[in-house]
Amino acid sequence: MQQFGEHITAIPGGGRFRLGQALLILGGGSAVGGATAWFAAQLQQAWSPWLVFPLVAGLALGVAMVEWVRLVHAGHRGTIVVATLLAAAALTAGQHYFSFRAILRATRQKAPALEKARLLFPENSLQSPLPPQSFGPFLRWQAGRGRTIGRFVARGGLAWASWALDGLLSAAAALAVVGLWIRRRYGNLNQGKGL
């Protein structure tokens, strides 16, 4: 049994690029990112401090990716890193998609009451427009409505920039976990083979 701090230099099947294994880890990594996004979207409804939440989601994604890589016995470091980046992109986009689905579902449930209110008070009907029915226009609508960050509301380009920062923080946290695992599993990266 390997002791902590010892480095494995040769893992059966590890280190070589294999197309089948790459497709498995990349596809599975995207699924892991999507599943993590669903859990993050559920948690985000109750707790989502800015800057902290994307780091927590990224750490969870990193742990999930390590477990996925261990499950499929992936050994090619570059493939593992690319799969983690793909999973981080799925996490970031997935959180917005699952929020979109939740808002769409809530809007459909409230549609009869909203229609009655619109008929009774037509002058107020334009103050809170309904969200678009497709994902791309929904993101633009959401950016236009703004994202509250403390006492500041980021709208338009600033909302998009804050979402991009969330994605980068999640990716960095996931890569930190996966990178530490790779280093522990494959040894010091300075011994000739980098990521």
Residue ranges of model-derived segments:
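Hydrophobic alpha-helical segments, chiefly the membrane-spanning helices
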Residues: I8-L104, R108, I182-G187
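Short, charged cytosolic
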Residues: M1-H7
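Core subunits and conserved enzymes of cellular information-processing
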Residues: L61, H73-L195
